[in-house]
Amino acid sequence: MITAEERRALLDRAITTYGAPAQMDMAVEETAELTKALCKIKRAQAGCEVTAAIGNVIEEMADVQIMLDQLRIIFHRSTEEVEEAKLERLKNRLDGRNNWQGSNLHKWIEKQFSTGGDGHE
């Protein structure tokens, strides 16, 4: 198994060898391949077809993860803070604190149409 230090060195080497622009292009390609694999899995019918499709999705997920790690190196940024904020937003949505039905905009629109208003006060 590769260590974290070996992984980082290998990713740095790939960026140095191929260049950041090429690795950004490769990230686009790999995400497109994952998209295609996910679309195919929804069409899979037979057991062996489903198993192969799942294997393909897992392989493409690994490729995308490797490219995401390279993008973090290229841009000298972690996604941790942004991920935390997005997960908090998702939690709020799931907990009903940030849903459409409870939003001020929804309430305003409902009020306008329920009272026959034209949206002007």
Where is each model-derived feature located?
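Flexible "arm" and connector segments at domain edges
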Residues: 1-121
